[in-house]
């Protein structure tokens, strides 16, 4: 039976929550994790620069937001990506806010090389999923001499993926709906930690 990971995630999370409630503990405590104190990062999708400007102004009005993740990899090409990112820079120029980039697998190898260098000169902290899922064999060409840390998202659905790709990445981005729930997420985090990789947890 082909059950989508999001269905597994719903069942898995419900089971973990049930066990935590039986133990009369918050789930994070039941999992042995510290109290959550992670600064909030919000994502801005691919949009025309004028829409980006409006959305950034709304988002940064929330003092809890300490970072923005910008979606690039536009079907209109990397020059359009540059316009989007430049608008974000302009809208946040007087703020102490981190800026990250998620290409969503929207670049070729050559485009990724160009954009990583360009972004590294313009405040970007890291690049997420620069290449399309399935092109992981090309990551080694980006990793050598990289100008930005490389995270993978779609290329890391399960803990086995971390073991396959850890040589050519700096971190992984995991999502419960993508990996099938808390059980697999904990495995991913443990494997990533064993390889000294950084980790992020996102939603979808």
Task: Give the predicted meaning of each segment.
Residues 72-204:
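Catalytic core of soluble alpha/beta enzymes
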């Amino acid at each position: 039976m082909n059950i989508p990971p999001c269905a597994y995630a719903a069942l898995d999370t419900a089971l973990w929550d049930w066990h935590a409630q039986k133990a009369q503990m918050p789930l994070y405590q039941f999992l042995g994790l510290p109290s959550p104190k992670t600064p909030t990062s919000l994502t801005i999708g691919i949009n025309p620069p004028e829409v980006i400007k409006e959305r950034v102004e709304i988002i940064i009005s929330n003092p809890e937001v300490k970072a923005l993740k910008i979606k690039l990899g536009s079907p209109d090409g990397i020059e359009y990506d540059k316009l989007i990112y430049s608008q974000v820079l302009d809208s946040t120029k007087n703020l102490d806010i981190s800026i990250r980039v998620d290409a969503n697998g929207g670049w070729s190898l050559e485009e990724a090389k160009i954009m990583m260098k360009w972004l590294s000169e313009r405040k970007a902290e890291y690049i997420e999923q620069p290449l399309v899922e399935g092109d992981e064999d090309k990551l080694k060409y980006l990793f050598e001499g990289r100008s930005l840390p490389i995270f993978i998202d779609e290329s890391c659905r399960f803990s086995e993926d971390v073991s396959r790709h850890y040589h050519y990445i700096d971190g992984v981005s995991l999502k419960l709906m993508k990996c099938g729930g808390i059980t697999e997420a904990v495995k991913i985090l443990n494997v990533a930690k064993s390889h000294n990789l950084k980790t992020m947890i996102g939603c979808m």
